[in-house]
Amino acid sequence: MEIGILGLPLSGKSTLFEIMTALRSRDVHGEVCVRGQATVPDDRFEHLVKIFQPLKVSPAKVPFVDVNAVGERAWDALRQNLSGADGFVQVVDGFSVDRVEEVIKRYQQMEDELIISDLQIVENRLERMEKTSKKGLSPQDVAQAQILPLLKEQLDRGKPLRELGLTAEEVHSLRSFSFWSIRPELVVVNTAEGNPGMADAFKELVAPQTPVLGICCLTEAELAGLSREEQKEFLADLGIEEPAFGRIIRAAFSLLGRIAYFTCGADEVKSWVIPACSKAPKAAAAIHKDFERGFIKAEVVSYADFQLFGSAFAAAKAAGKMRLEGKEYIVQDGDIITFRFNV
């Protein structure tokens, strides 16, 4: 799992990367591509740490990639370093302009790069298929011949493939093309101090299914440099419950369809990241493949039930909230699990 950060020069994308990952991307030996991990804020996890007081604490992480390149080489650098990204966060400058139409224009400029790249891929593939059609098409070619014209029509309209409403099966069948605009995207509008309404105005003008969040990177960078107690005071003065970058990290986490379950004990409290709708054996594989191979049962209690019954396993079990689940159980976000296995 990896999320690429997109944005025009001076949009604030590298600043956002630095805030979320605590890395100075522009100072890493002049490298074009910098990778870092952001901790996913989770009150449930913090509560479990307080209860178990473990020797080791392992919160959920989201990997981000920032590419520092400008000019003619910028898009080539993006292609090279973000081709494996599962989704994108596009940061848009909303602080240096007064009109939301200008923000839309800058957002669309980056979207157009993705769309044009995908259009070239589709056209090249259709051209090759036309040349080889006389020799006969494979079943895979036949399936592609049916869907590629639909993709081309969407791209010709200047619309990203993610807005086409493709099924999960169709998206999976197109993975070999590595389309850019088919991947999920979160838009972050970097606003001026005191002008959060710019992000709201932007959201009104883009596709309804486009997730949009606003942030003032200038304020958030100042906040990130403070201690935990100083942050609380700073936020209280502003009447804000949490830093905006925390919401962005969580939104990026859910954007990729990920959830977290917990394992808890005196040695370690850990948040395990898995795809949503994972069955128990696959969730166990996140710990070790042997857990999946020798899976017997999963002892499960939801975080909500655990907290409701005094944050104690014994009380939750006495109340009938501790369950033994089999191979078909679909793990839910926030489950606290102990796996039983035998290899």
Regions found by a protein language model. Give the residues of each.
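Conserved G1/Walker A P-loop phosphate-binding module
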Residues: 1-97
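C-terminal-of-GTPase-core extension/linker across diverse P-loop GTPases
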Residues: 2-17, 21, 33, 128-332, ...
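Short amphipathic alpha-helical segments
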Residues: 18, 28, 100-104, 199-201
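Short, intrinsically disordered, mixed-charge
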Residues: 22, 50, 112, 116, ...
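Conserved Switch II/interswitch segment of TRAFAC-class P-loop GTPases
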Residues: 39-41, 67-72, 85-121, 127-141, ...
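Amphipathic alpha-helical transducer elements in NTP-driven molecular machines
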Residues: 41-45, 61, 75, 82-86, ...
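Residue-level signal for inorganic ion chemistry
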Residues: 48, 89, 122, 190, ...
